[in-house]
């Protein structure tokens, strides 16, 4: 375990509309606003998402199990923002449901909004963190400097 203490900086309230590409739009805001460390919450709907539902086996590095989510899904999730060099890295876990059928997963790509998706981004000030590639684990891991 490792941790640092910081404070909440700027707060952004964002609305994505029907058909918007959510992850692409979020990356655009992060880059434009220069949000280097942050946390965000997501509430609304997605109609498309490519997600990882966990590892095939609990080993390091894990082999991800991919799933395509299609159709209207009520969505609630939370994620973090840290950078790997000049590239922001988003880590988002969300529950996506439809008529009682719910899937919880790591949302990775291909996200298209259904109706509306509301996002609140909290910038974290006062810490020096990044998300470089962690070869042993096979993923980008939060690291403090």
Question: Which residues make up each language-model segment?
Answer:
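Flexible glycine-rich active-site/ligand-binding loops centered on an Asp-His dyad
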Residues: 105-145
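Broad gene-expression machinery/nucleic-acid interaction feature
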Residues: 11, 37, 89-93, 104, ...
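Mid-chain, well-packed structural core segment of small domains
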Residues: 64-108
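Short, structured patches in soluble enzyme cores that scaffold and shape functional sites
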Residues: 18, 44, 96-98, 121-125
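Short, well-structured hydrophobic secondary-structure segments
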Residues: 17-74
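Short, intrinsically disordered, mixed-charge
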Residues: 27-35, 96-99, 109-112
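Acidic/polar residues at beta-strand termini and the immediately following turn/coil
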Residues: 6, 68, 84, 132-140
